[in-house]
Amino acid sequence: VRITLNSLLPAMLILASAWIAATAAHRERSEGESVLPENALLTGQVGGLERTRAAAQIVAVTGQPFSRALRVTIRDHAPDSNATQLTIPISAPVQRGDALMATFYIRGSSSGGTAPAQMMFLFERSVNPWTKSIAQGALSARDPQTWKKVLVPFSAAENYQPGEAMVSLRFAFGPQTLEVGGLSVINYGRSRTADELIALAAQQNPLGETTAQVRLQETRQTMLGFGGNFCQPRYGSTEPMDAVGRYNLQNLRVVYARIGLPLNGWTPERGVYRDEAQARAALLQIQEFNRRRIPVIASIWEGPGWMLGGRPEQMGRTLPRERYADCIEAVTRFLVTARDRYGATVEYFSFNEPDYGVNFKFTPQEMAEFIRQAGPRFQAAGLKTKFLVGDTANGANFVAYARPLLEDRRIAPYLGPLTFHCWDALGALDAQYSAIAELGRRYNKPVWCAEAGHDAQLWQAPNPWESWENGLRTALAYEKTLRLTGSALMLYWTYQDNYPLVSRDGTRPFPVHHVIKQMEEALPPGAKIAAATASHDELRALASVGPKPGQFSVLLINPIGEGQTILRGLPPGAAVRVVVSVGSAQRQSSSARTDRSGFLRLKLPARSVVTVQGSP
């Protein structure tokens, strides 16, 4: 075969062109590629203005990297933050696992100027099930005229072609005026990792010098403690406990457990009750928790087709009124079987997230009628089990759902604690969470969080469980919930292999496990939550006192770059244990002592959870 230079030249040119194109593409991706249309923030239409009596306009801006901004004025409250929002479809493809950075600037204030403005940034699928790669809240600076730069690093949860995903800016956080400018979303592909972008964002946004004031004499709720959900039998497991659950029972202080009552397996036919498979696993769970002196909540997710109808795991199904008696009898038989055959009791019962419909959906009026019928049947069977009030999907809508139940005096004898899930903690208004505490005080009811977590869609993200981001955001959700709602009990979702705290084989704890352990040590049963405030909006502070005389603690969470704080209001000359958790290492302990004024200077590493514990 004879090969000449002339015959090779076309192939060489093709290879050279391909190399040049590949090099250019790599350089372009390493520098980042915008996934939004040009000026999309300024040309898109804000939807749902009528739902909050809102107005939107473009305003001129000086002294910033952008010359125009979107101003949105919200004049009314809405039940959901997406009632008024701007959605922007992406204009470039994105691959699962790509690292992206969103940047925008925000300024404004709530109506009356008493609080910062608030919005939420989301990157999500454009259609149901609205898979979310990120949902990040943002507050403006305290000065409504000051622009605040916000960086949101994240990784893509799925593959998307143009138009298949969108950026959503949610504005319905109560009456407020806010301005947003300089929006960009840059995709770095695989040239940078999400962790690298997270570190970069923290570096560009240092906390700096701060102060935190503790008022140990200003106390609130008394902590019942921390616990968890043990719901794998509800999802089909025939074993009561997996390796993750066993590890957590051994290494965490579990003060309460919530299990799933698998009604679909317990009563597959009307009048038939089977103590086998998933139902038996749940009954064995109750027995084991009773043996450990851990009180139990039993909640229902799914029901049998003959009772509830529809498809298995279908959302939003309403139990027909003519089936109330059948359902009540089935639940009663389960609780009696636990008592008489397993020697175990259930303190409280609920339907999981009945407001949202997972999977039973009840209006408050329907729930009141169900309880009105079930309460006497429980009592006739000799059961002391009471109903949780609410057990709602989120905290923002809890008060609207629970108040009618509390106002119905016919069911008052059958009601237990006010209960909600804090999945919306990082996006809900402070006022919405504070209203939960107010409702508890009004009706003299304890408040519990039956599912504690920060993102109900986290399972959609690529391997999020081992990340420090998961641990840090869990701490933020716990702090806000405890500080505002008056919750005395936090039940993590879950202490089994579902949103796991440790590896599946139960041998390797994840960072989030260490965070839970750190917080439960700082906020033990019997401690009273005490007031604490920080000089910087991003720094979170929570204090407690007791249960022993002279015992106190402070929880500090810094979600941005490194800084320092001076803790004020602590006992003078007190010996303290300082515990620091960051992405690279968790629960690193050292000793310190407050000065004669009760001050303590602390370094706060970037993206850290820090606890200070003082003992008599």
Per-region residue spans from a language model:
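Extracellular polysaccharide-targeting segments
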Residues: R29-L42, K149-N159, A172-T210, V214, ...
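Extra-cytoplasmic beta-strand recognition segments
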Residues: S30-E33, P37-L42, V46, L70, ...
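Secreted extracellular polysaccharide-interacting domains
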Residues: R51, V72-M101, P116-M120, R125-A138
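Short carbohydrate-recognition loop motifs
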Residues: I58-D80
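Extracellular carbohydrate recognition and processing domains
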Residues: N128-P162
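Substrate-binding cleft and catalytic face of glycoside hydrolase catalytic domains
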Residues: V214-Q217, N251-L406
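Aromatic/acidic polysaccharide-binding cleft in carbohydrate-active enzymes
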Residues: P446-L523, A527-E538
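Carbohydrate-binding surface patches
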Residues: A534-A574, R607
